[in-house]
Amino acid sequence: MLDKFTDYKSPIPPGVRLPEIKIDDRHYERLNIQKGCSNLDFLRQLCLNAVKSKGIDKKANKQEYYDRAKMELAVFEELGFVDYILLNWDIMNFAHENDIPTGYGRGSAAGSLILFLVSVTNVDPIEHGLFFERFVSKSRAKKTIVDGVTYLDGSLMPDVDNDIEFSKRQAVIDYIKTKYSGKTCKILTMNTLTGKLCIKECGKIVGEMSEDAVNAVSDVIPKQFGKVFALKDAYKQSEQFKAFCDSHQKVFKIAKKLEGLNKNCGVHPSGISISYFNNEDIMPLQKTGEGELVSAYEMNNISEITVKFDILGLRTLSVVYETCQRLGLDFKTLDYDSSSTYKYFQDLSNPKGLFQIEANTNFHVCRKVKPRNLFELACVLALARPGALDFMNQYAEYVETGNFQSIHPFFDDILGVTGGIPIFQEQLMKMVVKVGFTLDEAETVRRIIGKKKVSEMPAWKEKISNKIKENNLDPAISDVLWKVAEDSANYSFNASHAVSYATLSAVTTYLKFNYPQEFFLALLKSSKHEPNPHEEIETISQELAFFDIRLLSPDLVKSKSDFDIEDKNIRFGLNAIKGVSDKVLENLLAFRQKEFSDKIDCFDAAKEAGLNIGVLSSLIQAGTLSSFSEKRCRLALEAQSYNILTEREKRNIKLVASKYNFDVLKAIADLVKNKLAGDDAKPFMSEKRFTTFRAKYDSYKKIYEMNKTHEKFANWFFEKKLLGYSYTHKLRDVFSEEDEQRLLTTYEISQLDPRQPVKIVGVVKEAKKKTSKNGNKYLFIQISDEYGQMSCRLMDGREDKLTRYYEGGGKTPEEDDIVVLYGNKSDDSIFLDSLSILNEKIYTKLSDLQS
């Protein structure tokens, strides 16, 4: 970008000038550091203090730590990075001083001992064999000095990403904005047109194709590990897509031209820019809808003139911190790295809440590998990625047997620990060092191979060959090393990142299986931060039974604002119920302090809190007043009837309620029938008033009559709708049929051998017509029940099942439909013979009946 401004006098800085570090005076006294010392001396003293506080001065290999720290400090000073390290320390120190949990590390930064000493990371790089050069390499750093001022090449600067506890992330950002006022902003990103979108839109507009037709075409565009192929690659990989493109050349040609063009701009979700200069002096700015400043330079350009920080909110840290706080533990000093933790990976079936491991691919790899220590767990995370996944079975066999395939005896000590597979980029670096290069040079090789810098590869290939000759090594080593370098570029992973994240995976495993009640409580509390909180609650609730924990119903009398422990179980929090606003909740809790003696008190409190009768009726149907042991449909009718009454009529009902055991309907009926006088000696209701009351009451009564015939389903429906899960009835129990094939759950089906006949009822999460790689059309359905999820497929096959289903009037299920499915179990799905959509309906208002 700078090259475009050479004709202008200093339009922007010639590089990144680091923001001026403002170290608070209190730090000098607190850390016993002489005020007025240089930033380098301040950083050095921070490290010396940490050597004692972290017990490094007691280690047998303490000299290794001293030498490494000395080397890293020298490199930081030489390259001009001291202030950058202190910037990171200052931000993370603010978090630590304010009891804001931070992560163990992310990316290559975990390879720096200095960052570990100043608590920016919490993974010991020497203990885990991590390389500093993977984080900072002199061979790929550049600085310019202009008029005595140092400017850094932003594209070659180190990059520290910081994980912050999710709910406290904004506090850290506010600190940065306050301390560097006028010099911070968010960062612009550009969103581009995907090939899949282009082919669909061009198909509709240029090819005049229907929506179904273009969807069918886009479905055959291949994807690998969730990433959709570019159009030119899809053309080579898919015969079906190639056939379409050959017959619709104009559509394909235009779509290829549009693919990759900027569609719109966005804001980087975690990035924040900090500059030495005021923002308006060096860059154009714009404002978000919330009034926050955003650079008008996009992400790659702004890094050439300012420092970019990633402040990421990590929900897992919220869960870990909440769990530890309740137990009185310090999560940075947990005894998680022991055989007692890794035994849970030997037969893992409940991955919810385990950091990284709960993702489907990672879970699959973990079950296959069965890691026995932190290093093997790091290998699991590294293998669960495109390319690397091909080596899963090979590595799993090595873990089980200890046998591996040697590519050359010279490298066995490096590759033997990972089953002969260069799982980590650092292993390639070790191989390069072993033939005679420095770690800096090894990082250069890794970088040019990883970035596919084709023009630089031949020179380095020759250098390696010459170095091997110079050191009188086997000439075959040259070809072996270069092949590993080229191949591993497609799958090798950063060991620093893998170890950091594996540490958090191990911590969550330790907490979940040793303190399940506290861990699940924290998971449920954090569900509010998820994009779909109720879906998250449902997923969490599916595992609770395996730990002998019940998720007790929300109760307007017993529940607290948030989820809480009750005996050996967990009580649902009122703030997680759909339709209950923060204001209503606050009012409800305030009224509840005087204790509800009966349901009429509850009806009054709900109205005073601002809860409308529709929401209250739904809450009653969901069981939030079950402590009064009433039939829910009837209790809802009581609340609705009570709501119709005038204030005078309500007073009179309260006077006689105890006589009728607080049954509102009986009290109203008796008072009206016997024309009893109220507290003012007037009749309870005039005939005219009764006619008005009766008209409204009849509407509610009709709904009651309809729903009470399916009360079990009504209870399930409202629980699922408002809470995300059903605690009184399992879906299977609601629709069980004694005389027919037994309904199974997703868990029971998962335990069956393939080819077993199955019948299941579930809620549709997704349903879509698709086309297989072989060109066969099928209906894909993803369903869920209280135990998990399962994918199902209805295909034609020899019996034309799909065709017969639609010709017989069958419809594609919609999200949240309830379906009964019949078929046979495959490895991890069901191949369907037939399906039926259940038409049971719950009525919530009179218009439902009229329609």
Name each region found by the language model.
Residues 5-851:
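Noncatalytic, beta-rich nucleic-acid-contacting surfaces in large DNA/RNA-processing enzymes
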Residues 1-2:
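Charged alpha-helix within mobile-element recombinases
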